[in-house]
Amino acid sequence: MKKSLFFFAVSLIFAISTVTGAFAKDIIPVRPNLSQVTTIGMYQVCDDVTIYKEPDENSQILYRVRWTNDEFFPSEIGFENFFVVFLPKKNLAMVSVTDFNDDWVEIMYDNSTGATGWIKKDDPYKFMTWINFYNTYGKKYGLTLLKSSPEECNSIKSAPEETAQTISTINHPKKINLNVIRGNWALVSVLDMDRTPKTGYVRWRSDDGVRYFFPMLKECP
C-alpha cells in the first residue's frame, strides 16, 4: 500500500511539472501572421494589465490580464494569443500595438481574433514602432526568415524595389545581419552555409504589413 502511494505521488509530481513546463514555453513568431498586419509596433507589458475599451480609466474594462512564467489568466486568451514575443528568461513579454496616444496604447490582446483594447502606459519607452523594434533587435542579433514566406523573399536585390536586379538568393543562411531599413525593404548582409557573403536588399514586409523576417531574439542574452 505504501509503495503504491509513493508511486502515485511521484507520478502526480511528474504530471504537474510536465504541465507547468508546457505553460512556460517560449513564444516567438515562426510564420507570417496575417491578423497582425494593422499593427504599428510592440509594447513590453508588465505581469498585471487592465485592458479598457477606450483610452479612459472610466471606460468599460474588457479584461484584467495577469501572468507568471508558468500561468496565464484569463485562460480563454492564453499566452500564445496574447503575446507576440514571450521569452521570460530574457525578460521579454511583448504585445502588438495598433494605435497610441501620449498616455495609452491600443494593443491586440487576442492574436487569433484580432481583438483590441487599450492599456495605460507605465513607461513611455516600452513602446517601439516596428522600425525601432527591428533597428534595436534586428541590428543587434540578426534576422530570421519566417517559415511559409513567399519564395521571392529569398531574392537579394540591388536596390529597394521589386524591379531591381536580383543579385543573389538566400539559400541556407547561417546569419542574416540587418544593416538598415528603407520602407518595406531591408539592406542585409547574409552568410550562407557555403560561407559566401551576400549583401543587398530583401523584402522584409509586404505593402499590406505582413512581416516575412523577424529579429533573432533567441540569440539575445
Residue ranges and their predicted role:
Residues K139-P197:
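Intrinsically disordered, low-complexity segments enriched in Gly and acidic/Ser/Thr residues
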